[in-house]
């Protein structure tokens, strides 16, 4: 959902994207390229804008992406969880099992062609909620280090109404359940070294 920037909530696919960082700009550039290829060459496309996806088999050693994995890796190493600002910024954290079925089903679905879809949770949660869920999944008290706030969108979540209209409504995994599943996987595999770039 990085393409949206700080727009109206919930973010909807028909809003004009206003990405604020290189990550969001790059994602939007790919969408524009796909649309141009459709117009010029007849290439069909399907774009998914997933919401803060986390889950088993994720690279938890990447210190720049995915707060759930970062928190788990730190907890397993006895380090505090780094929270930027007050931790009250919200995101719609979405377990991978809530995203993957849409991707699998889209190819055979004619109604999905040449369309952009938001996919993910419609229940925004704070970063502090994530810290609490991770600590609970590991059976520890949350230890948090507050870092200076970053220049980022404070609240980000989007509507999945278009996705539900095309793919149907699906049961979603709660943050707590998803974190428990990922924590069970992480405990089996252990912490990962973090690249210090």
Model-predicted segments: where are they?
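A conserved pocket-lining segment of Rossmann-fold NAD(P)-dependent short-chain dehydrogenase/reductase
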Residues: 14-18, 45-59, 70-94, 118
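Active-site proximal helix/loop that lines the substrate pocket
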Residues: 2-6, 52-58, 88, 108, ...
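Catalytic helix-loop patch of NAD(P)-dependent Rossmann-fold dehydrogenases
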Residues: 2-47, 59, 63
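Conserved active-site helix of classical SDR/Rossmann-fold NAD(P)-dependent CH-OH oxidoreductases
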Residues: 28-35, 39, 69-72, 100-101, ...
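Conserved sequence/active-site signature of Rossmann-fold short-chain dehydrogenase/reductase
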Residues: 1-3, 46, 53-55, 67, ...
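C-terminal substrate-binding subdomain of Rossmann-fold SDR/epimerase-dehydratase oxidoreductases
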Residues: 75-197
